[in-house]
């Protein structure tokens, strides 16, 4: 019994030390980040102020590589456990923006008069000569009181 307890203690100590080394290596190189073929960065913000919801979207690609971006965005409201689209007058309640340049930004606004939890759902599809299309999904929640 003493031998198995000692063995278990040593095994746990080795596992913990190895996992700590792996985490140290990741933090030493500045963390882990994804690499995209045609897209450098995106920025999405969503706020509601004075009964107006505002979704701000921007992206930056790579000069000489990025050729086109399609950005789809919508606002959804949470009811109990489910999310439902807020009517913005567009097909499928989705704003669709096309860009034929390396970077772009757009802001959409919508009247929101009911209090509750809302979110902006944004999908960036960025095309270019760097490889397969980059598809980035971002969700930003906001509680309107």
Where are these regions (language model features)?
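Bacterial N-terminal signal peptides
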Residues: 11-20
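Sec-dependent signal peptide cleavage junction
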Residues: 21-37
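Short, surface-exposed binding/anchoring microloops in extracellular/periplasmic proteins
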Residues: 37-77
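Solvent-exposed serine/threonine-rich low-complexity stretches and specific carbohydrate-binding patches
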Residues: 84-100
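Surface-exposed, short loops/turns at beta-strand junctions within beta-sandwich domains
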Residues: 102, 109-117
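Hydrophobic/tyrosine-rich beta-strand signature of extracellular beta-sandwich/beta-rich modules
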Residues: 120-122
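Short beta-strand elements
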Residues: 128-145
């Amino acid at each position: 019994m003493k031998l198995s307890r000692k063995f278990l203690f040593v095994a746990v100590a080795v596992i913990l030390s190895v996992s700590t080394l792996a985490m140290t290596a990741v933090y030493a190189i500045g963390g882990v980040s994804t690499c995209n073929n045609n897209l450098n960065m995106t920025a999405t913000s969503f706020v509601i102020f004075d009964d107006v919801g505002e979704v701000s979207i921007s992206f930056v690609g790579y000069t000489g590589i990025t050729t086109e971006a399609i950005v789809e965005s919508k606002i959804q409201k949470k009811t109990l456990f489910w999310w439902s689209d807020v009517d913005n007058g567009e097909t499928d309640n989705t704003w669709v923006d096309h860009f034929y340049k390396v970077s772009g930004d757009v802001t959409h606004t919508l009247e929101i008069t009911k209090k509750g939890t809302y979110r902006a759902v944004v999908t960036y599809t960025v095309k270019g000569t760097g490889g397969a299309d980059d598809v980035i999904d971002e969700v930003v929640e906001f509680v309107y009181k």
